């Protein structure tokens, strides 16, 4: 993922043991962050001022908020929760499969079991933690027009209002297994299930 921040462009990778930032023009390593996590699936996530690195492999399930323009080994020491390079961190709560969403002033993290945690994006303060419903989540969520979309493996698309208070707006039942991350084009949400491709949106009036 290329992060174009106010200082430079950084190619950010999230891998086992380390996350790294590279100069995309030369491939030179700019920084590295020890995560102490053997398995990493989620992508890095860009917010307004920080990039978020997560992993949900037990026993360590970290979330790191990395500042732009850092250089060298930016790893936290054993007793640290932040340093000059990392704005904040959590050693529990990182997702195993799903990539979080940085949307507006908040970072939203959904666990495999459907526990949605909302953090203040700049400080890491927990704003709320709520159960979405559904059994399991593999697909990463999406955000658009002030709404968050979470697709369970059981084929239920849950729509949550973005913001500091949890509000479930709708549940759309598709009736088929869903594991792929949906995509948004225009005002249509496309969801690929095991047997079908769904296009969800408002029906346009006939001309």
Briefly describe each language-model feature range.
Residues 1-207:
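Noncatalytic, solvent-exposed loop/strand surfaces
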């Amino acid at each position: 993922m290329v992060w174009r921040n106010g200082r430079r462009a950084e190619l950010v990778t999230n891998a086992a043991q380390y996350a790294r930032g590279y100069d995309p023009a030369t491939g030179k390593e700019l920084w590295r962050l020890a995560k102490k996590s053997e398995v990493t699936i989620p992508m890095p996530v860009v917010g307004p001022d920080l990039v978020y690195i997560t992993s949900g492999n037990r026993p360590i399930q970290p979330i790191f908020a990395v500042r732009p323009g850092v250089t060298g080994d930016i790893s936290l020491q054993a007793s640290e929760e932040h340093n000059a390079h990392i704005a904040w961190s959590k050693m529990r709560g990182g997702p195993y499969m799903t990539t979080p969403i940085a949307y507006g002033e908040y970072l939203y993290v959904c666990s495999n079991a459907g526990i949605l945690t909302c953090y203040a994006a700049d400080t890491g303060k927990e704003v709320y933690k709520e159960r979405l419903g559904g059994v399991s989540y593999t697909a990463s969520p999406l955000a658009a027009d002030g709404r968050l979309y979470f697709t369970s493996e059981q084929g239920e698309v849950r729509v949550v209002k973005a913001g500091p208070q949890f509000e479930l707006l709708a549940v759309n039942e598709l009736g088929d297994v869903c594991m792929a991350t949906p995509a948004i084009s225009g005002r249509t949400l496309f969801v690929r299930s095991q047997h079908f491709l769904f296009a969800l949106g408002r029906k346009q009036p006939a001309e």
